[in-house]
Regions:
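Anionic, Ser/Thr-rich low-complexity intrinsically disordered regions
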Residues: 1-72
Length: 72
């Protein structure tokens, strides 16, 4: 018996997609802040955390994928 099923894979895929969109939006915001001369130190640090979280979500997605035997 697999620990994950197709619903888990769909959920993981959705989480990754949402996190990718969030990261892209925030990255664009940080670039705009930099262009306007704002201090982006904290924003850039947060962007790194977003990327780390996204990477973890992708790892989880791959685990679910392997367990369900599905293809993305």
């Amino acid at each position: 018996m697999n620990a994950f099923d197709k619903n888990d894979l769909e959920r993981a895929n959705g989480h990754v997609m949402e996190a990718e969109e969030r990261h892209a939006r925030y990255s664009a915001l940080v670039r705009r802040m930099a262009v306007t001369g704002q201090d982006t130190t904290d924003a850039e640090n947060l962007l790194v955390r977003f990327k780390e979280t996204l990477d973890l979500m992708r790892q989880h997605q791959q685990l679910v994928l392997r367990q369900t035997g599905s293809a993305l």
